[in-house]
């Protein structure tokens, strides 16, 4: 791997974008999101478009979404009320060019994205909020690896931005620049007076700075003990899961139910323990009034289906899906408004809110966290020569974190990427394709 160039891509628009120079406060949803850079890696077989065309399309897309070209900063309202903001200063998107002599097929076979996206910055302040690496392979293939800061966008927004970028490359001069909804303030309008009715202190936030007893070196050592594995559930396997559930059931629900059961079995947890899954829920349509579908930013809260290990392992797929569905349904308009009101009250009191999201090196066992990319518009990441041959999984630095990714091509299916302790990973790989709903319970009771 050789990095051949590194440059900041900046945009120029006439007249300037209305947000140019603004310091946009983070919304309540932004503040609850991970304070991390999230990698995303697309692989394209030859023939692939030129790097110049990909960069020009990126420039056009960034002009429509100027927040990604800014930087995280702190407002100047005094020490007690200092808040992070997105400074729309057009400092630029970092773009790296790289070459590697091996063929792309070797990378696709290994399904490893190491070194195929920019290194994750140690600090958010001053770092480019969107960074891109274009890696050319000896066979003519191309990998587009990017990292974006989660305070700028959630998965839905990242998917929309990437689809816009691809369309700009594909359509070139015929591309019509969109006008997405960039007003983050509409996501968090509190009642007057604000009246939170749920306890959000232990769910989305905790009061005070998030502390960690681990140094960076200790966190890195913990990450080394985590095994990143990937398993593919074919379209036929997913159909069999849905048949086990019976009735209406989404791909996400049935695959999550299956993974939750099998990972819990692989962990060998005590039957009286409880296990829960942190499930990201897109709140755009659930809010009252609903937010625009093209709202760019964060608008995600979390559901927490929770079951006792004994019950989870002995329950049918139908019952586990029911528990997941019931937990997600509780993230409704009333809950969303309560969350917004809670943040308003905490700010009025001068409380420092720290997100409860896990940090690299942390272990979630006996719990899990799932991010679903199944509804993302990856098929629209066609740069003009066809959709990606694969969406590669980045390293997952948190034990118990899993990602569901749609399989490209005609076959369909779902790729599950998960980080587990080494021995749990080995056990999971041995049972992950078993459809015996109660097969593992006898070893735990």
UniProtKB/Swiss-Prot annotation:
It is an enzyme of class 2 (transferase). The active site is at residues 150, 382. It holds the Pfam family Transferase. InterPro entries: CAT-like_dom_sf (IPR023213), Plant_Fungal_Acyltransferase (IPR050317). SUPFAM superfamilies: CoA-dependent acyltransferases. It comes from the Eukaryota. The keyword Transferase applies. Its EC number is 2.3.1.-. Hydroxycinnamoyl transferase that catalyzes the transfer of an acyl from benzoyl-CoA to tryptamine, to produce benzoyl tryptamine. Serotonin and tyramine serve as acyl acceptors in vitro. Can use p-coumaroyl-CoA, and to a lesser extent caffeoyl-CoA, as acyl donors. Belongs to the plant acyltransferase family. This is Tryptamine benzoyltransferase 1. It comes from Oryza sativa subsp. japonica (Rice).
């Amino acid at each position: 791997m050789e990095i051949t160039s590194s440059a900041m891509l900046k945009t120029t628009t006439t007249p300037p974008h209305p947000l140019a120079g603004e310091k946009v406060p983070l919304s309540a949803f932004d503040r609850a999101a991970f304070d991390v850079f999230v990698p995303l890696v697309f692989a394209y077989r030859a023939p692939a478009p030129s790097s110049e065309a990909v960069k020009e399309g990126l420039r056009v897309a960034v002009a429509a979404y100027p927040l990604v070209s800014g930087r995280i900063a702190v407002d100047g309202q005094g020490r007690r009320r200092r808040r992070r903001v997105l400074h729309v200063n057009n400092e630029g998107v970092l773009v790296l060019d790289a070459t590697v002599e091996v063929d792309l097929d070797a990378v696709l076979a290994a399904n490893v994205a190491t070194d195929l996206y920019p290194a994750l910055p140690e600090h958010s302040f001053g770092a480019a909020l969107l960074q891109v690496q274009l890696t050319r392979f000896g066979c003519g293939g191309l990998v587009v690896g990017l990292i974006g800061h989660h305070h700028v966008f959630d998965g839905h927004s990242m998917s929309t931005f990437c689809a816009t970028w691809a369309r700009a490359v594909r359509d070139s001069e015929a591309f019509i620049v969109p006008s997405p909804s960039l007003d983050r303030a509409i996501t968090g309008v509190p009642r007057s007076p604000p009246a939170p009715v749920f306890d959000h202190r232990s769910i989305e936030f905790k009061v005070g700075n998030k502390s960690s007893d681990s140094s960076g070196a200790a966190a890195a050592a913990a990450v080394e003990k985590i095994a990143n594995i990937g398993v593919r559930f074919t379209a036929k396997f997913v159909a069999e899961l849905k048949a086990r559930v019976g009735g209406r059931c989404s791909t996400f629900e049935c695959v999550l139910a299956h993974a939750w059961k099998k990972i819990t079995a692989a962990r060998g947890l005590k039957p009286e323990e409880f296990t829960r899954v942190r499930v990201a829920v897109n709140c755009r349509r659930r809010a009252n009034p609903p937010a625009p579908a093209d709202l760019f930013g964060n608008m995600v809260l979390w559901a927490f289906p929770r079951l006792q290990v004994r019950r989870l392992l002995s329950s049918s797929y139908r019952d586990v899906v029911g528990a997941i569905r019931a937990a997600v349904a509780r993230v409704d308009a009333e809950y969303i408004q309560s969350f917004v009101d809670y943040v308003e009250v905490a700010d009025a009191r001068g409380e420092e809110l720290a997100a409860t999201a896990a940090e690299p090196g942390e272990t979630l066992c006996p719990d899990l966290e799932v991010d679903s990319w199944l509804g993302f518009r990856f098929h629209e990441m066609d740069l003009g020569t066809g959709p990606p041959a694969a969406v590669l999984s980045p390293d997952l630095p948190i034990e118990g974190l899993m990602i569901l990714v749609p399989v490209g091509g005609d076959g369909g299916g779902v790729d599950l990427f998960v980080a587990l302790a080494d021995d749990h990973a080995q056990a999971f790989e041995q049972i992950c394709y078993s459809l015996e709903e109660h097969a593992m319970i006898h070893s735990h009771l």
